[in-house]
Amino acid sequence: MGFQRTRLRRPEIVAGVAAVVLLLSMFLLPWYGYKGDLAPLAARLGVSTSQDAWHSLSTTRWLMLLTVLAALALVYLQGTRRSPALPAAFSVFVWLLGGLTALVLIYRVLINVPGPNNVVTSDVGAYIGLLASIVIAGAGYRSLRAEGIAPQDAPKEIPTVHFDQTEVATPS
């Protein structure tokens, strides 16, 4: 069972791309930074003025990583399986994990940033990560709604049974 890109539908492609965006934003983009007069002072002292998600969200990072892995597993399973059973199950996991991650990130990015609110602010990575988690949840839902057998995996001809007699036998 090799991976066939033709088995992927739009929701799985979107989930895979959003998972990669979330993963990259976790490590490469600043999620939180100092605001106000502290940022220039910290920069002059050689202190980093921003942190990525991996270093600033000690518990949430595991949920985010699990969401990324589930979305990538959905892409892999959809591309390698002829039957929709496993991809359908993973669509549910991706939908639920993406939704839970989005809710947690809404809280951590928009409502309660780590650290004092008058000192720490959310940066671009936090908003990109939040958007990516919302997209993953939506793609998981759309993938679940579109479940079925791909046209190339469908049976070519459905066998039918022909009866020559139209009479019904009566018991004697």
Q: Where do the protein language model's features map onto the residues?
A:
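Compact integral membrane and secretory-pathway proteins
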Residues: 1-172
